[in-house]
């Protein structure tokens, strides 16, 4: 994980040597280099999402929007993640966005958990089932932050506007109060 956080290329042979293990053991534990990187990326994202939630003000949809916006800005500004996506684009997109991988399902679980917590606290009424909303929020983030197809990669302001609309949160740009 430290190698990833320093921005270095993740080489299974080097990691195995650092841990005093054989490369085969590392592959047995994780299955593949991509799964190993997925574990590292998911684990690195968890404290960032918790920090974004801790810094968000208010409750309900507004707190969710601020949390997601803070997390998205962390991802967009993260030099190490950007370097990884630029250096290994195809592998990075598979690792980050695959439903069969580690990162995407873990992010959906964490985002859905935040939504459920606001619902259970009586602070938010979700427009759809929380797991569906969590999935949509994560996919939106992936599209706006990592997919260059529409020329909007890294556009966190536009991402915030779309998330606000989906969450039913009023923003100064939208100017009207949406149902919570």
What are the roles of these predicted feature ranges?
Residues 32-37, 48:
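Short amphipathic alpha-helical segment with a characteristic S/N-K-E followed by hydrophobic residues
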Residues 39, 52-81, 133-137:
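Hydrophobic alpha-helical connector segments
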Residues 13, 24, 34:
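Residues within the helices of the helix-turn-helix
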Residues 73, 109, 113-121, 140, ...:
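C-terminal peripheral helix-coil segments that are non-catalytic and often amphipathic
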Residues 1-14:
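Short, amphipathic alpha-helix enriched in basic
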Residues 41-50:
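Short, basic, alpha-helical segments at the C-terminal edge of helix-turn-helix-like DNA-binding modules
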Residues 83, 94-123, 131-138:
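Amphipathic alpha-helical packing segments from all-alpha helical-bundle domains
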Residues 20-30:
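Short hydrophobic/aromatic patch on the recognition helix
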């Amino acid at each position: 994980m430290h190698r990833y956080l320093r921005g270095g290329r993740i080489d299974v042979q080097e990691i195995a040597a650092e841990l005093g293990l054989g490369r085969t053991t590392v592959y047995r534990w994780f299955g593949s280099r991509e799964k190993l990187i997925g574990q590292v990326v998911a684990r690195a994202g968890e404290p960032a999402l918790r920090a974004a939630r801790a810094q968000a003000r208010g409750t309900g949809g507004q707190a969710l929007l601020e949390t997601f916006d803070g997390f998205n800005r962390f991802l967009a500004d993260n030099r190490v993640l950007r370097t990884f996506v630029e250096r290994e684009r195809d592998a990075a997109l598979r690792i980050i966005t695959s439903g069969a991988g580690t990162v995407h399902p873990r992010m959906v679980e964490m985002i859905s958990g935040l939504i459920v917590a606001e619902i259970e606290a009586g602070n938010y009424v979700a427009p759809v089932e929380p797991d569906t909303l969590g999935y949509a929020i994560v996919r939106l983030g992936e599209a706006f932050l990592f997919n260059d197809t529409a020329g909007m990669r890294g556009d966190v302001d536009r991402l915030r506007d779309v998330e606000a609309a989906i969450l039913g949160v009023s923003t100064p740009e939208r100017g009207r109060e949406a149902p919570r």
